[in-house]
Amino acid sequence: MAIAWGTVPSLAPVNLKKEGLQVVKEDHLSAREQGVKLQGNGTGFRQEPLCKRFRQLRYEETTGPREALSRLRELCRQWLQPETHTKEQILELLVLEQFLTILPEELQARLREHHLESGEDAVVFLEDLQLELGGTGQQEDPNQAKKQEVLMEETAPGKATPERQVQPEGDVPQPEREKGEAKRIENGKLVVETDSCGRVESSGKPFEPMEVHYKDSNLDRQQAEPKEKTDCKCSEYGQAFFQHSDLIKHESSHRKEKLCEAEVCQSLSLPGHQKICSREKGHQCHECGKAFQRSSHLVRHQKIHLGEKPYQCKECGKVFSQNAGLLEHLRIHTGEKPYLCIHCGKNFRRSSHLNRHQRIHSQEEPCQCKECGKTFSQALLLTHHQRIHSHSRSHQCNECGKTFSLTSDLIRHHRIHTGEKPFKCTICQKAFRLNSHLAQHVRIHNEEKPYKCNECGEAFRQRSGLFQHQRYHHKNRLA
């Protein structure tokens, strides 16, 4: 009888028990070693996780205890960033890092592809992943990953001969064990054979047929698979798979190949839209109708409607619903522009600004409206513009009957009737109806004047002030 073991390594000594025979196998990697191994696979300084460099600093790499302690403090500060993060955020980082460490290998690999901000986002992502896999991808217990027990019981114990004994592990020659723990039943003695492919065979006439029971969930799933791979088969190419999760991964490659047939997808400047079209958006926001591919993205989006903004800038007091928004905003104060154009060397604060700029070098055709010929740099702006021609104004105000094409416009309009001013200045407590009005007001306290005249160098707080000033130069040139 041959049993396919899959990826199970060589077996440990065989022990005889009252119920049957038990083979216990220890994994060659501990849980901590697996966690360190999966911290990240980046090769560059920026790609390597800061927590990994903090955890793996060795005393031999330093000149003494003082330098070792100093380097640990610096690495910990770079990782946790106490100057920008609160105590709750630092605690969440530590919990999230430990949570990723105790997860199984395949789940760790998937989670590290997405830059999640909190443990709650990771839990939502895993729950969403379980729904996508249809319940077939069972989560493995980390304790079971350390030990995999195989119980082999005889189906006919009454026929067992008293002379049958277990051959000790030391009796097997070393070269034979290296080939796969080769053991067989000869002259009434049990010898278990494992070839190089990981198969276990039992032979010999005195030995009775044996039943195999697997306690590990991984082995349960392997033995429960059909002999012929007919249940998990690709509907397009007919390729068969042992596990349903492998079939889902394979079918996702087909979805990426099938791009949306909409007209906006034909533009070469819309690779982001093509990625969106490769997957369905099954999670919809009940407030504004916006749909998302993952439930974690929906939870993050709903913070906007709830008004929850836990991340605050220490420089100007501006608050954000997401940590990524705060980090992006901090570049305004620091002047950091990390996105570099390889063609002209110009730097940008945001990646979207770099992508928009690179269209100048690539000479990509902008998104053009077929009705009026107006061009836009982004497909989203074109979609909003096309609603003007289609007269699609499905959102109506119950107070005055005015209609709007976007839900966000209707929400802003409602504040006129209700008098709601949700955006408050943290310095003087003055409230505003629009966030843009608050941003203009904060510049008064910060004495910030971002709009500068290219001719005389005079700066202004608002764009309208710059336009009025430029008219003055224009009149002088005409005179």
Swiss-Prot record:
Q: Name one Pfam family in it.
A: zf-C2H2
Its annotated compartments are: Nucleus
Task: Mention one GO biological process in which this protein takes part, according to its record.
Answer: regulation of transcription by RNA polymerase II
Q: Which PROSITE patterns match?
A: SCAN_BOX, ZINC_FINGER_C2H2_1, ZINC_FINGER_C2H2_2
Key words of the record: Isopeptide bond, Metal-binding, Nucleus, Repeat, Transcription, Transcription regulation, Ubl conjugation, Zinc, Zinc-finger
GO molecular function ontology, one term from the record: RNA polymerase II cis-regulatory region sequence-specific DNA binding
Q: Which parts of this protein are zinc fingers (C2H2-type)?
A: 232-254, 283-305, 311-333, 339-361, 367-389, 395-417, 423-445, 451-473
Classification via InterPro entries = SCAN_dom, SCAN_sf, Znf_C2H2_sf, Znf_C2H2_type
- Answer yes or no on keyword Nucleotide-binding: no
Map out region (Disordered) in residue numbers.
155-187
Biased composition, class Basic and acidic residues, residue ranges: 174-187
Q: Where is the SCAN box domain?
A: 51-133
One Gene Ontology cellular component term attached to this UniProt record is: nucleus
Its main localization is nucleus
- Sum up the protein's function in the record's words: May be involved in transcriptional regulation.
What is the protein name for this chain? Answer: Zinc finger and SCAN domain-containing protein 26
Q: Please report the organism this UniProt entry assigns to the protein.
A: Bos taurus (Bovine)
